[in-house]
């Protein structure tokens, strides 16, 4: 029998610390529950075990604590945010049918060892899933450790351990006896490190072998002294580190076969945890109609034909197969392609829908605008809880306890649709978010549908040639690197790259990971001065990213009409910003010459021109307005260069005396203050000491006192309310502020400071998009809104409409709100995006 045993505590800790804190809309922490399930599902998919045991530590002391008071004494307690998730996770695993095992006085490691030994004796094979290398001592031909690392799960068999450590798996405990283990506070022999311990065990075979050969010349005098003086500690460490195989638990592998569990309870719990995609991965059905039908018999409704002259209110949603249906009372209508378009603009009809954007696509394709759509449940759910990972009608109905009124086999979620839209509308009204939905988000869905439909023309041949030149450049860079290092290697392998830089070239290593030397961008940036190879490696990475993500990615996304049709997502960013995918046009790089060249391949159609309008320093203007700081407001009102004016005020010098370096410093702090940067981050950005940066920060806050007061008030109000708001009333819950973890809490404070500003900027650009799109239609222009990127709008216009479009963009963007400081938009034109910007 193939048995999979999970080291529960090890893996749940890895899940908790490896995933940022996730919460439900009511503030329940879920990241560890989410991550553990993903680990388990991936293991099941990859290995198809016959039985699964999940082993947990108990809170009670073990025999190791009895033997040594210091055992694990240096470990901190479990974070409260994780502790709250543990009982929920264990209940979920029980509902899913998994057998869990623990024993007071014994550790999960001992349970792994006991089950592996018993299954091997029965002729089976065992997979031990853990993030703890202690379990490697259990590896043999029948037992494989699946070692979870930050990036992947490594199967560790005897050959892999021999290759990595130069010893057999059972000898790893001999190594630990000598070197100790800081994480478990196992002492070992003071002064004997891993390298020495490995060498001793490789030569003498075991701890006992080392002590039997203390007179051997291979043992240096100082090592001999340490070994002789600490023999009892070494033997104690051997006992502490040895995994036992005789824990008093059920050892029959058949005992751990997965049971039926309680699927309905699991589905309900997952719905409460807002883990909808995981519900599907477990093969559970959480549609409200299905759940209710399992508990009671609902009246079955047969779909009907929509009346030829529909009137009144209908609720619309989409089945998983893409078909649409409408609900009116206890009637369900399946909508075919002929009747749906006319319904979307029918006079005398009001449509509450779930996910308006696809419907706006249909309306626009048929010459309409979707005028009958008055409410979107998906957008309402997003406004109520922007932190959710997904928004699906059936899942939200279960989450909001919207009970189905009937069952309909042809539309499983139809029975609860009206109840769901009712509760979402009520809750949005209670939150004061209806105006945000009606005037911004719902009209914006129409605008985004139109932008997706229109697309953005590109010069495909130019992109191909650019790709060819990048490949040639990459090949040249690669040859330079090989010449500098002295041999060829796989540049995409962190291990081989680390060996080339730190072993072959002798560069000073900055930090190490579990897999070896760190070769991340930050590390390489710090090593630029040591070797020209580092500069080439960074350049290689930049060019590779351009080629694979943008050049090849854009060509794959090219439509038959020669245009890129990106998908714009309204319900992803917690700040309210729009994102895009397939491809992501908002990440087209502009900070490098090569990256900005990509914008040159986004072109206007023949006979057309691109008109580009970009807000100038919108977030700083919002900061000046929202804080009421007179000095900052005056700088904007006078039309001054805000960064130059800031530098002049901080250093008490005339603006004419502000150097480029001083302006750069002022710019860094102007933007850094909104993102909660402290002296350390600011100093790093500016290349100055922490002390200098701290002085700079204090001077800045003394110069603009209301900015500091506002930032502090943001945090206090957010802690009191549990959320922050934009000036438009968009809310973002911040459960991070209640965390006992300092880093998590600090992150929440940064979000409390930044979200009102960044979120308000997002709201402004959204509202401007709605106004610009409508104005182009009202003035019956052929010009079309193509793209929004951060604070920038791009319109494609016929030559004879360019001046009119420039005026429309400037007026609508600058007049969309009236604040204490003016918004300004800079407008440019060109045949390419690069020229227009």
Residue ranges and their predicted role:
Residues 1-129, 133-155, 159, 233-236, ...:
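Noncatalytic, basic helical substrate-engagement surface that gates or grips nucleic-acid strands
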Residues 3-4, 8-53, 69-70, 74-81, ...:
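Conserved RNase H-like, two-metal-ion catalytic cores of nucleic-acid enzymes
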Residues 50-53, 98, 121, 140-144, ...:
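Non-catalytic nucleic-acid-binding/docking modules located in mid-to-C-terminal regions
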Residues 152-176, 183, 322-448, 472, ...:
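Active-site-proximal helix-loop-helix substrate-binding element of RNase H-like nuclease domains
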Residues 230-338, 347-356, 413-593, 609, ...:
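Conserved "right-hand" nucleotidyltransferase catalytic core of DNA-directed polymerases
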Residues 360, 366, 378-407, 411, ...:
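Function-dense linear segments that define catalytic or interfacial modules
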Residues 453, 565-566, 570-573, 648-781, ...:
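Conserved catalytic core of nucleic-acid polymerases
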Residues 472-479, 483-532, 702-750, 754-756, ...:
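C-terminal polymerase-core module
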């Amino acid at each position: 029998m193939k048995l999979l045993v999970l080291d529960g505590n090890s893996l749940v800790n890895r899940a908790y610390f490896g995933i940022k804190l996730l919460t439900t809309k009511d503030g329940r922490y879920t990241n560890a529950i989410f991550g553990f399930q993903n680990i388990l599902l991936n293991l099941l998919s990859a290995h198809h075990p016959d039985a699964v045991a999940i082993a947990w530590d108990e809170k009670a002391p073990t025999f190791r604590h009895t033997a040594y008071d210091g055992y694990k004494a240096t470990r901190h307690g479990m974070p409260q945010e994780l502790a709250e998730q543990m009982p929920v996770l264990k209940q979920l695993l029980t509902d899913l049918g998994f057998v869990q095992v623990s024993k007071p006085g014994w550790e999960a490691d001992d349970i792994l060892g006991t089950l592996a030994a018993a299954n091997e004796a029965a002729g089976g094979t065992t997979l031990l899933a853990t993030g703890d290398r202690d379990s490697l001592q259990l590896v043999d031909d029948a037992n494989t450790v699946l070692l979870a690392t930050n990036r992947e799960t490594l199967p560790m068999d005897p050959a892999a351990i021999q290759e990595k450590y130069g010893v057999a798996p059972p000898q790893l405990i001999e190594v630990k006896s000598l070197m100790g283990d800081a994480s478990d506070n196992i002492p070992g022999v003071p002064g004997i490190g891993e390298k020495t311990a490995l060498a001793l065990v490789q030569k003498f075979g075991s701890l006992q072998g080392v002590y039997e050969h203390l007179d051997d010349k291979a043992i240096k005098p100082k090592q001999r002294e340490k070994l002789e003086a600490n023999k009892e500690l070494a033997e104690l460490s051997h006992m502490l580190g040895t995994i036992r195989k005789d824990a008093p638990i059920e050892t029959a592998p058949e005992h751990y076969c997965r049971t039926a569990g309680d699927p309905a309870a699991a589905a309900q719990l997952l719905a409460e945890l807002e883990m909808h995609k995981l519900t599907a991965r477990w093969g559970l059905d959480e549609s409200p109609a299905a759940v209710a039908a399992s508990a009671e018999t609902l009246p079955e409704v047969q779909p009907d034909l929509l009346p030829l002259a529909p009137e009144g209110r209908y609720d619309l949603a989409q089945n998983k197969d893409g078909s649409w249906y409408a609900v009116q009372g206890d009637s369900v209508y399946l909508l075919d392609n002929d009747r749906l378009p006319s319904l979307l603009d029918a006079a005398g009809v009001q449509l509450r829908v779930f996910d308006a954007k696809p419907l706006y696509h249909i309306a626009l394709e048929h010459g309409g605008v979707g005028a009958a759509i008055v409410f979107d449940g998906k957008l309402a759910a997003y406004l109520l809880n922007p932190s959710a990972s997904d928004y699906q009608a059936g899942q939200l109905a279960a989450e909001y306890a919207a009970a189905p009124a009937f069952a309909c086999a042809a539309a499983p979620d139809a029975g609860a649709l009206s109840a769901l839209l009712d509760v979402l509308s009520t809750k949005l009204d209670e939150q004061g978010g209806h105006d945000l939905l009606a005037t911004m988000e719902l009209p914006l869905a129409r605008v985004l549908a139109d932008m997706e439909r229109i697309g953005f023309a590109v010069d495909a041949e130019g992109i191909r040639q650019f790709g060819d030149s990048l490949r040639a450049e990459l090949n040249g860079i690669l040859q330079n690197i090989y010449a500098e290092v002295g041999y060829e290697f796989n540049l995409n392998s962190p291990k081989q790259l680390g060996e080339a830089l730190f072993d072959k070239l002798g560069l000073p290593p900055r930090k190490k990971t579990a897999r070896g030397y760190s070769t991340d961008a930050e590390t390489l940036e710090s090593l630029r001065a040591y070797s020209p190879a580092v500069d080439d490696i960074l350049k290689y990475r930049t060019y590779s990213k351009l080629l694979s993500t943008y050049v090849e990615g854009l060509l794959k996304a090219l439509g038959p009409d020669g245009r890129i049709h990106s998908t714009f997502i309204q319900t992803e960013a917690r700040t309210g910003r729009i994102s895009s995918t397939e491809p992501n046009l908002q990440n087209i790089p502009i900070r490098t010459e090569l990256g900005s060249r990509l914008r040159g391949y986004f072109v206007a159609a023949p006979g057309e021109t691109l008109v580009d309008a970009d807000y100038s320093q919108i977030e700083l203007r919002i900061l000046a307005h929202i804080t009421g700081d007179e000095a900052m407001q005056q700088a904007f009102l006078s039309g001054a260069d805000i960064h130059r004016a800031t530098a002049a005020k901080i250093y008490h010098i005339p603006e004419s005396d502000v150097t480029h370096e001083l302006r750069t410093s002022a710019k860094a702090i102007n933007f850094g203050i909104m993102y909660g940067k402290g002296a350390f981050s600011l100093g790093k950005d500016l290349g100055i000491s922490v002390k200098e940066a701290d002085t700079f920060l204090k001077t800045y806050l003394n110069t603009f006192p209301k900015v500091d007061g506002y930032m502090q008030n943001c945090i206090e109000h957010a802690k009191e309310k549990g959320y922050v708001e934009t000036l438009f009333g968009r809310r973002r819950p911040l459960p991070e502020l209640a965390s006992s973890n300092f880093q998590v809490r600090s992150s929440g404070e940064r979000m409390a400071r930044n979200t009102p500003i960044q979120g308000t900027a997002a709201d402004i650009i959204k509202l401007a998009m709605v106004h610009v799109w409508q104005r182009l239609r009202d003035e019956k222009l052929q010009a079309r809104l193509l793209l929004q990127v951060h604070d920038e709008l791009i319109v494609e216009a016929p030559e004879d409409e360019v001046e009119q479009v420039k005026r429309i963009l400037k007026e609508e963007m600058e007049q969309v709100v009236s604040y204490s400081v003016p918004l300004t938009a800079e407008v440019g034109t060109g045949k390419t995006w690069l020229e227009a910007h």
